[in-house]
Design a protein with these regions (language model features):
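Active-site-proximal substrate-binding core of FAD-dependent oxidoreductases
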Residues: 486-500
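C-terminal segments that line or cap access tunnels to active or ligand-binding sites in enzymes
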Residues: 311-418
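Helical element adjacent to the flavin cofactor pocket in flavoenzyme catalytic cores
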Residues: 199-250
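A glycine-rich dinucleotide-binding beta-alpha-beta segment and adjacent secondary-structure elements
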Residues: 174-186, 403-467
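A conserved FAD-binding loop/helix module that cradles the flavin
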Residues: 463-485
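Mid-domain catalytic core of redox enzymes
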Residues: 211, 241-355
């Protein structure tokens, strides 16, 4: 039996481990935190459970790409999801003109809902949606299609910046901003983020949006169960402290518990720049290390987790996005004295969700430079001035939510806040980046980090290799597994099992 040790038990590590274990590998996952899951992790405060990430997911409709991967793994019937409202999958509020836009489900719902506000743009919206879907057709992996093209050809749209792609099809400046509202989900930056990434994320949510019910950790548990059912283990509280490399070959890894692990293959599911700190300098060519260390990281976030008073605030079955000004939609990655430029507000669903919400979440993009003065501190030891700063930022967000929902603050019972430092220290991501390496249409290969490395039995996985998020990371896990098992091997297996 072939063996694999996976460094990091986040979404990428667990999906890769589950796939390899299903294909006969004995898998050991080493995770530094008390629970596995990365962005699927929860924490407990005030007697309730809060999700740290993966609040809104796509690709889980019947026949969707992540649905099919879960079916292949044998867990789809155990995933607990709640679909958001069909007539309003998301709502967008722009403070600038006090306008709210509700986005309908599906291609027609999207076009119809926005045509109500911009009737003269209906034909352009149709062309835009067709162009979005057309771009996804250029990415075979997104559709789980086997491909023999190592260097596939692409359209001119594929190589545009996302904002330029939108402007090519949409004339009205306000509507351009509206259709770009999801760009924080991929770390969007104006004149930088590639159009194809915007298209992939947008098309996911066109097809239906879901939420985990009762906590996203239940999904992490399902992936762990696949690994364990096939003879593998997921060891928490056991981060890797050293990767022993000789002659471009990993001999073993050593954990914080002093244990040494050998395997046929080693897979790193942590940020590549973090991996470098665990290895000898000569493990990789200097040019490779320099290149990866020079790639900018996407921005981070500041989040507020709220316990609500009983029967005080209604459960809202869709996400609400708040924006200050239309022309700020692409500026989340730029320094601004006007923070927050925007945020996501939602009420996560509980099992047997009733009329009223028990908790709420506010999360707003934030740059790591906003917390740079505390970068050398650790969790729980950042000082009084840091706590004061967090309180101020929290109040800024609460004041904005009051604009959406007058009287909301009176419904709040208790509050906990997390900054980019929290994300950095718990997720192990450089600068608390939410979406890994930034992607730039002007130099797409720079941030397309291959899963294979110059170390012959070390392979990478996770959001830094290709696409971020709940869709991108599982797709990269397929690439990682196929680097071992052979091109298209997993895709053929998925299609065999799911093409019914």
């Amino acid at each position: 039996m072939k063996t694999a040790v996976i460094i990091g038990g986040g979404l990428g590590g667990l999906f890769t481990g589950a796939i390899l274990s299903k294909e006969g590998f004995k898998v050991t996952v080493l995770e530094k935190n008390t629970t596995a899951g990365g962005g699927l992790q929860n924490f407990n405060r005030f007697g309730m459970k809060f999700d740290t990430g993966m609040h809104v997911i796509g690709g889980m409709h019947r026949g969707g790409n992540i649905y099919r991967i879960c079916k292949y793994l044998g867990i789809i019937d155990k995933v607990s999801l709640k679909e958001v409202d069909n007539n309003c999958t998301d709502s967008l509020y722009f403070s600038e003109d006090k306008t709210t836009y509700c986005i309908g489900k599906g291609k027609e719902g999207f076009i119809d809902s926005l045509s109500e506000h911009f009737p003269e743009e209906r034909d352009n919206l149709k062309k835009y949606v067709d162009a979005v879907l057309g771009l996804t057709e250029e990415v075979n992996l997104f559709h789980l299609r086997p491909s023999s093209d190592i260097f596939p050809s692409h359209s001119t749209d594929f190589f545009l910046a996302a904002d330029a792609f939108i402007a090519k099809y949409i004339t009205n400046p306000k509507l351009r901003s509206v259709v770009a509202y999801m760009n924080p989900l991929y770390g969007g930056v104006g004149d930088e983020s590639p159009a194809y990434i915007h298209a992939i994320i947008s098309s996911l949510y066109l097809q239906g949006t879901y939420r985990f019910v009762g906590g996203s950790d239940s999904f992490a548990d399902l992936l762990v169960s696949v690994i364990e059912a096939n003879g593998g283990t997921v060891n928490v509280n056991e981060g890797v402290e050293w990767v022993e490399v000789n002659n471009r070959h990993v001999d073993c890894v050593r954990s914080c518990k002093g244990n040494s692990y050998k395997a046929d293959y080693f897979i790193s599911a942590i940020h590549p720049c973090t991996l470098f700190t665990l290895m000898p300098e000569n493990a990789f060519p200097k040019a490779y290390r320099t290149r990866l260390n020079s790639i900018p990281n996407s921005y981070s976030a500041f989040s507020v987790y709220i316990k609500l008073k009983p029967n005080a605030f209604p459960y809202i079955n869709h996400s609400e996005y708040y924006m200050t000004k239309y022309d700020e939609i692409w500026n989340f990655g730029k320094p601004s004295k006007a923070w927050p430029l925007g945020f996501l507000f939602m009420t996560p669903p509980e099992i047997n969700q009733g009329k009223y919400a028990d908790k709420a979440l506010i999360t707003s993009p934030m740059l790591f430079e906003d917390v740079i003065k505390w970068e050398d501190t650790t969790v729980g030891k950042r000082g009084v001035d840091y706590e004061t700063w967090k309180d101020e930022k929290t109040q800024h967000l609460l004041n904005r939510v009051e604009e959406l929902h007058p009287g909301f603050t009176a419904c709040v019972d208790k509050i906990n806040a997390a900054s980019p430092l929290t994300i950095r220290d718990y997720y192990g991501t450089k600068e608390g980046s939410m979406c890994g390496f930034s992607k730039d249409y002007k130099n797409i290969p720079l941030s397309q980090v291959p899963v294979v490395t110059k170390v012959d039995n070390l392979i990478l996985t996770g959001q830094n290799n290709s696409l971020p998020g709940f869709c991108g990371v599982p797709l990269t896990a397929i690439n990682t597994a196929e680097a071992i098992l052979g091109r298209n091997y997993i895709l053929h297996r998925i299609n065999e099992i799911t093409n019914d």
